[in-house]
Amino acid sequence: MTLPAFLFAALGEIAGCFAVWHVVRLGGSHWWLLPGIVSLAAFAYALTFVEAEAAGRAFAAYGGIYILSSLVWMWTVEGVRPDRWDATGAALCLAGAAVIVFGPRG
């Protein structure tokens, strides 16, 4: 259940943060904050379904998924195509997340 939880968490976190961004940076209605708060709460709840021994490890591994999901959001929602540096950074983060998730534990 870890990957679906990570993906749901990413959607919740990105949508919630974008709602705040929309209000503060783009001058959107403060009503955007209501779904933003709900989205951020859903993000936090989703991470409780990650199969990990410690919350910190789950959060650290999630970081790679969050970064990749943020770039997909940027491309599909905001219409800004990621460049090679975005892709390189995301690949490095996913590699780090894979080490955290799949590394041998004694």
UniProtKB/Swiss-Prot annotation:
<dbReference type="Pfam" id="PF02694">
    <property type="entry name" value="UPF0060"/>
</dbReference>
<feature type="transmembrane region" description="Helical">
    <location>
        <begin position="84"/>
        <end position="104"/>
    </location>
</feature>
<keyword id="KW-1133">Transmembrane helix</keyword>
<dbReference type="GO" id="GO:0005886">
    <property type="term" value="C:plasma membrane"/>
</dbReference>
<feature type="transmembrane region" description="Helical">
    <location>
        <begin position="30"/>
        <end position="50"/>
    </location>
</feature>
<keyword id="KW-0472">Membrane</keyword>
<feature type="transmembrane region" description="Helical">
    <location>
        <begin position="4"/>
        <end position="24"/>
    </location>
</feature>
<dbReference type="InterPro" id="IPR003844">
    <property type="entry name" value="UPF0060"/>
</dbReference>
<protein>
    <recommendedName>
        <fullName>UPF0060 membrane protein Xaut_1380</fullName>
    </recommendedName>
</protein>
<keyword id="KW-0812">Transmembrane</keyword>
<feature type="transmembrane region" description="Helical">
    <location>
        <begin position="58"/>
        <end position="78"/>
    </location>
</feature>
<keyword id="KW-1003">Cell membrane</keyword>
<keyword id="KW-0997">Cell inner membrane</keyword>
<comment type="similarity">
    <text>Belongs to the UPF0060 family.</text>
</comment>
